[in-house]
């Protein structure tokens, strides 16, 4: 009779341990579930992103500390109120000057040669009609002097990404997560161009990696916007309209196979004989651009492993077998969500 209380105590202890174990298991499952739900919300595709809510009506702009939308600056205003500071860039079509307007830094682009005015004005029309979260903000323009004023981005283009991340101020941002998000935004822009208000547009100013990267600016809050819209020809497959990026021979490993002269070195290049192509040239270039954007930070190799299959699809020799930009974008988003979930679960287990 004296042993019964000890048996009861033993039984009670086991019951307590079982209850504690079940509570712990329930906590782990609940935390994981909440993390999954949170990450799904954070990384699910959204119609509106970083600056979409700040877009102004057509013909207006808002930059930096300006709270309200203002009309695009006119020739008179640009002449009176915009002050050039220094030359910061120069391409085939225009020179770009860091300038100042009412204490704000802006980029002033000026035509280099009147022979290229058609390209310049085409770029202006594109900027006017395609203002969105994917495109640099148009501040003003003057057709009389062939001048375009846009928002200035001090971090430069995607070509300067590694240099930007090397500064102590930004080293904390140099993670595979942030680099993959930049990759997603780059592909989002390609997808926007392929489904633009003007139809299917091809980014022709991209015959080598540096040239392709220089078309996209890195904003101060680490987003990507298209900056140069001078060379965006339209493809319309239903009407049989394909394009050629310029009238000169294109060479190199960066461009798609269909952009190369197909008749060998023994036949002199002729634009009349060169076949046209479609937007799948942009898809071919995605893996090389993304490889640069991912860099060599810790975790980037895991990201590359998860992107291997979709990048293999992008590299198909037959353009029709390559995925659309939307398919690439969907895959990138899924990979980011998956890796973020895996990381969150691993961190939760470590805490427990």
Curated annotation (Swiss-Prot):
Which UniProt key words apply to this protein? ATP-binding, Endoplasmic reticulum, Kinase, Membrane, Nucleotide-binding, Signal-anchor, Transferase, Transmembrane, Transmembrane helix
GO function terms (MF aspect) = ATP binding; carbohydrate kinase activity; phosphotransferase activity, alcohol group as acceptor; protein kinase activity
Topology, Lumenal side: 38-352
Which SUPFAM superfamilies does the record associate with it? Protein kinase-like (PK-like)
Any single GO CC term annotated in Swiss-Prot or TrEMBL for this entry: endoplasmic reticulum membrane
What EC number(s) does this enzyme carry? Answer: 2.7.1.183
- Protein kinase domain location is 82-352
The UniProt catalytic activity note for this protein reads:
3-O-[beta-D-GalNAc-(1->3)-beta-D-GlcNAc-(1->4)-alpha-D-Man]-L-Thr-[protein] + ATP = 3-O-[beta-D-GalNAc-(1->3)-beta-D-GlcNAc-(1->4)-(O-6-P-alpha-D-Man)]-Thr-[protein] + ADP + H(+)
Topology class, membrane: Single-pass type II membrane protein
Top-rank taxon of the source lineage equals Eukaryota
Q: Which InterPro entries does the UniProt entry name for this protein?
A: Kinase-like_dom_sf (IPR011009), POMK (IPR039318), Prot_kinase_dom (IPR000719), Ser-Thr/Tyr_kinase_cat_dom (IPR001245)
Where found, per UniProt?
Endoplasmic reticulum membrane
Q: Where are the transmembrane segments?
A: 17-37
Q: Which ranges make up the Cytoplasmic topological domains here?
A: 1-16
Q: Does the keyword Transferase apply?
A: yes
User: What does the record list as GO biological process?
Assistant: carbohydrate phosphorylation; protein O-linked glycosylation
UniProt cross-references to Pfam families, sorted A to Z: PK_Tyr_Ser-Thr (PF07714)
What the entry lists under PANTHER family is as follows: PROTEIN O-MANNOSE KINASE
Q: Which family does it belong to?
A: Belongs to the protein kinase superfamily. Ser/Thr protein kinase family. STKL subfamily.
Q: What role is this protein assigned?
A: Protein O-mannose kinase that specifically mediates phosphorylation at the 6-position of an O-mannose of the trisaccharide (N-acetylgalactosamine (GalNAc)-beta-1,3-N-acetylglucosamine (GlcNAc)-beta-1,4-mannose) to generate phosphorylated O-mannosyl trisaccharide (N-acetylgalactosamine-beta-1,3-N-acetylglucosamine-beta-1,4-(phosphate-6-)mannose). Phosphorylated O-mannosyl trisaccharide is a carbohydrate structure present in alpha-dystroglycan (dag1), which is required for binding laminin G-like domain-containing extracellular proteins with high affinity.
The molecule here is called: Protein O-mannose kinase
- Protein source organism: Xenopus laevis (African clawed frog)
